[in-house]
Design a protein with these regions (language model features):
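Extreme N-terminal leader/targeting segments of oxidoreductases
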Residues: 1-25, 40-44
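Helix-loop-beta segment of a Rossmann-like dinucleotide-binding subdomain
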Residues: 22, 126-133, 149-159, 169-211, ...
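Glycine-rich Rossmann-fold phosphate-binding loop(s) that bind the pyrophosphate
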Residues: 29-31, 53
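N-terminal Rossmann-fold NAD(P) dinucleotide-binding loop
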Residues: 34
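Active-site substrate-recognition segment that forms the wall
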Residues: 40-43, 47, 51, 99-106, ...
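Dinucleotide-binding Rossmann-like beta1-alpha1 core, especially the glycine-rich loop
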Residues: 66-169
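A conserved short coil-to-beta-strand element within the FAD-binding core of flavoproteins
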Residues: 215-227
Length: 341
């Protein structure tokens, strides 16, 4: 395999930055947050430079659940403003990027009527983050009514529905026969988040020469003149002065701040792993929808069809962000155990 190399045009642009090393805003991190910030500033005519140490959108933005999540599970913690904002942004993406973002029918299997109903008000008003109890039909009904209410004026998604055990099993015969109800609502998903991110990036780059984006360039230090950048292909370092530096490194935010001489402890250091299964039986059992439920250990579990396969997730495991982040054999076995139930 031939080593990576920059195109002549990209090398010319980077050379121009070395010879005129200043910008109004320097954005560090080319995931979706960095790219979206870059686009917004570029379209406003602000001189802006974006740097990414690897491929654009190659980190957490690509290794996600591929959902455009309206935030239904945050209702129980009283994060109502977050849910309203998430629904608004979800519906905007459904309208503006229907070639990438699609409605996702989501079904919740329910095994009790009132479980969690009395603990929920405490969590709602105290914003407590403790391990939740199993959610029964009444609690889920209240939550989905609120979810429909918050999203009613922002899109045309169908309202939620409930089915009893008999109708649920007739519709989805592979479902656990111990269920008492199923609740179905709509969220959204996207098969290729990287493609949407590149479209957003292109909007910014095409705004004019005042907006420059470079991959395989990392922020490695700080000097009085500005941020020290390193060309990851040549190893050359140079310093860029900026009026404002925006750190959009995602899970690596603290490591970037440390490199810039400003140690922080903002990020929790956890990972959520997923696997993608080529299993026709499971694909058929999903019936074109997401199955969304809570495991006995308190973790949220999701599985849904994606590109003729089935995505299953997710874990919540502490990690050191200096290490390579991978899905371990133990996590794979955990997912297999979930699917086999």
């Amino acid at each position: 395999m031939a080593p990576r190399s920059k195109s002549a045009k990209a090398e010319d642009r980077l050379s121009a930055l070395r010879h005129n090393p200043s910008t109004r805003v320097l954005i560090i991190g080319g995931g979706i947050n960095g790219i979206a910030t870059f686009r917004d500033l570029a379209l406003q005519g602000t001189p802006v430079t974006l740097v990414e140490r690897s491929d654009f959108c190659s980190g957490a933005s690509a290794a996600s659940s591929h959902m455009i999540h309206g935030g239904v599970r945050y209702l129980e913690n009283g994060e109502l403003r977050l849910v309203k904002e998430s629904l608004m942004e979800r519906n905007r993406l459904l309208a503006s990027a229907p070639h990438y973002v699609r409605p996702l029918k989501t079904t919740i299997p329910i095994f009790s009527l009132v479980s969690g109903l009395f603990a929920a008000p405490i969590r709602l008003f105290t914003h407590a983050q403790g391990k939740p109890k199993e959610r029964g039909a009444l609690l889920i009904k209240v939550g989905l009514m609120m979810y429909d209410l918050f999203g009613r004026n922002q899109g045309k998604m169908p309202r939620h529905s409930f089915l009893g055990r008999q109708k649920s099993l007739a519709e989805m015969p592979h479902m656990n026969p111990d269920i008492r109800f199923t609740a179905t609502y709509y969220d959204a998903a996207m098969d290729n988040p990287e493609r949407l991110a590149l479209d957003v990036l292109r909007d910014g780059v095409e705004a004019g020469d005042h907006a420059q984006a470079f991959n395989y360039v990392s922020a490695v230090g700080w000097e009085s003149e500005g941020v020290v950048l390193r060309d990851e292909l040549s190893g050359e370092t140079f310093t860029v002065a900026a009026d404002v530096v925006v750190n959009t490194s995602g899970p690596w935010t603290d490591l970037t701040n440390e490199a810039l001489g400003q140690p922080t402890n903002y990020m929790g250091g956890t990972k959520g792993s997923h696997i993608v299964l080529d299993n026709p039986t499971l694909f058929e059992a999903c019936d074109g929808r997401e199955i969304f439920f809570e495991n006995s250990d308190g973790r949220i579990v999701l599985m849904y069809p994606i590109m003729n396969r089935v995505l299953v997730g997710t874990t919540d495991t502490p990690v050191d962000m200096r290490d390579e982040i991978v899905c371990t054999d133990e996590e794979v076995e955990y997912f297999f155990d979930l699917v086999s139930r």
